[in-house]
């Protein structure tokens, strides 16, 4: 039997198995609704029992990999850190009719006055969004941004008055990069009409030390994202599933969204500064890919000797799957 025929037969068998499971779930739903039993509890219990079956685990992994493959085909890839240009803090207010607004003046452009267009500011940069009144007009989804600099709310989603503020103090790397992405979006989609003299620009339209500090933090966050991207390629995240009794982590050649030639084995990847960990799939044969000094001495253990890795409790060092006990 050739490989293509065998793959087709396996897929058909998996499909029949999953159809049977679906029928069982339907039957259980009927019973549970009739006798007031919690469906979630019953399904979780059955899942724990069936986990002992290698065939059941294979069926679940096949389903997960099929979903991953479909998602990869239809999803739009996110832009990598290096694909977005750094924010230029200089805004030539003397050119092109740009203005320096006070916060009070900017408030007049909140969309409540028919005689004035709708403006908003982010990192002190003022954009004309009047062409999208269906988004920024009174009563619309994004009206809370109109007539003010609410930089922080672009990433926190806090639309209370106390959250509609310009400061970025205390924001995480990802939140700072989200603001950078929003600025890139507005630069591309809307006219830049000036700056607001407040936290990020002075009365002459020149960048303040606060803006310089924020942009330095954004660049640091960008470098952090690049380093994370490299780490993900070396130590891809594990597949995982959880229930009331714990869960399971396992590795495949596509786990973590990183397609590769090896599956690896699950390990705890420890962050040295915080001592937090995540599950990582680690190459367990041939030369390592991490470049760590500890793995260079071996030519056939992959990255297993990396100093930031630990075994999961009660899991075989060679196992492709590890149980997690809650």
From Swiss-Prot:
Domain Cytochrome b5 heme-binding: 98-197
Keywords on record: Secreted, Signal
Subcellular location: Secreted
Pfam families reported for this sequence: Cyt-b5 (PF00173)
Signal peptide residues on this chain, from the entry's feature table: 1-34
Location, primary (coarse class): secreted
A GO CC annotation given for this chain: membrane
Domain of life: Eukaryota
InterPro entries to which the protein is assigned, alphabetical: Cyt_B5-like_heme/steroid-bd, Cyt_B5-like_heme/steroid_sf, MAPR/NEUFC/NENF-like
Key word Signal present: yes
UniProt function note: Heme-binding protein.
Comment text on domains: The cytochrome b5 heme-binding domain was proven to bind heme, although it lacks the conserved iron-binding His residues at position 136 and 169.
Similarity comment: Belongs to the cytochrome b5 family. MAPR subfamily.
Name the record gives this protein: Neuferricin homolog
Organism: Caenorhabditis elegans
Higher taxonomy: Eukaryota, Metazoa, Ecdysozoa, Nematoda, Chromadorea
């Amino acid at each position: 039997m050739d490989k293509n025929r065998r793959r087709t037969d396996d897929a058909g068998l998996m499909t029949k198995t999953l159809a049977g499971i679906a029928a069982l779930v339907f039957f259980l739903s009927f019973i549970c609704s009739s006798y007031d039993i919690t469906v979630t509890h019953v399904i979780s219990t059955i899942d724990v029992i069936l986990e002992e079956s290698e065939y059941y685990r294979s069926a679940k992994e096949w389903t997960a990999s099929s979903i991953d493959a479909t998602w990869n085909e239809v999803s739009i890839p996110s832009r990598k850190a290096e694909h977005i240009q750094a924010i230029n803090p200089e805004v030539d207010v003397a050119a092109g009719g740009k203005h320096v607004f006070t916060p009070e003046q900017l408030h007049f452009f909140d969309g409540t006055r028919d005689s004035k267009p709708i403006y908003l500011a982010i990192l002190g940069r003022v954009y004309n969004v009047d062409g999208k009144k269906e988004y920024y007009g009174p009563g619309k989804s994004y009206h809370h941004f109109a007539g003010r600099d609410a930089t922080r709310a672009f990433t926190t989603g806090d639309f209370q008055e106390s959250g509609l503020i310009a400061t970025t103090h205390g924001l995480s790397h990802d939140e700072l990069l989200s603001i950078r992405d929003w600025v890139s979006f507005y630069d591309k989609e809307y006219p830049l009409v000036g700056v607001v003299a407040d936290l990020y620009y002075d009365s002459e339209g020149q960048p303040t030390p606060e803006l310089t500090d924020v942009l330095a933090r954004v660049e640091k966050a960008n470098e952090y994202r690049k380093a994370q991207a490299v780490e993900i390629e070396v130590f891809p995240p594990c597949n995982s599933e959880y229930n009331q009794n714990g869960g399971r982590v396992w590795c495949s050649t596509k786990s973590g969204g990183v397609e590769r030639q090896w599956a690896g084995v699950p390990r705890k990847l420890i962050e040295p500064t915080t001592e937090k960990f995540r599950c990582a799939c680690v190459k367990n044969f041939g030369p390592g890919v991490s470049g760590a000094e500890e793995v260079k001495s071996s030519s056939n253990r992959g990255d297993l000797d990396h100093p930031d890795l630990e075994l999961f409790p009660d899991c075989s060092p060679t196992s492709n799957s590890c149980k997690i006990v809650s």
